[in-house]
């Protein structure tokens, strides 16, 4: 009987804590830089880019890679599935630092342009897919 009561009390406590968590609001973390690279050169590009990234942009960026053993890697930086920068990285790291610095500058410029476009082209009477 004691064991039965213990199980009932434990079950009630579990249900009570479950109800407490149901009322909580999920917190979204802004400004994530997501790594979707596969090869070592892609990972190094992501590390170099993220180490130097100092933007106040609150959206999420994704760095994607399409590797090729023969030719190198095609790196794409996207925001909400919109491509804002693409480059080709060679496996021998030719001009690697220049490419990272150029990617940072172009990404920052593209994000600024995107923000200006969204501000100027705000069409509150149309849905996003209608414009």
Curated annotation (Swiss-Prot):
A Pfam family of this chain: CsgE
Keyword list, A-Z: Signal
Entry keyword NADP: no
Secretion signal span: 1-22
Record-linked NCBIfam families: PRK10386.1 (NF007701)
Role noted for this protein: May be involved in the biogenesis of curli organelles.
Record protein name field: Curli production assembly/transport component CsgE
Source lineage: Bacteria, Pseudomonadati, Pseudomonadota, Gammaproteobacteria, Enterobacterales
């Amino acid at each position: 009987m004691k064991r039965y009561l213990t199980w009932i009390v434990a079950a009630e406590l579990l249900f009570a804590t479950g109800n407490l968590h149901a009322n909580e609001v999920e917190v979204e973390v802004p400004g994530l830089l997501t790594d979707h690279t596969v090869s070592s050169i892609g990972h190094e590009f992501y590390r170099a880019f993220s180490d130097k990234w100092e933007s106040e942009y609150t959206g999420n960026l994704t760095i994607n890679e399409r590797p090729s053993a023969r030719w190198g890697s095609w790196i794409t930086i996207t925001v909400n599935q919109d491509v804002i920068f693409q480059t080709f990285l060679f496996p021998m790291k030719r001009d690697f630092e220049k490419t990272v610095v150029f990617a940072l500058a172009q990404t920052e410029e593209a994000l600024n342009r995107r923000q200006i476009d969204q501000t100027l082209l705000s069409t509150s009477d149309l849905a996003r897919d209608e414009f």
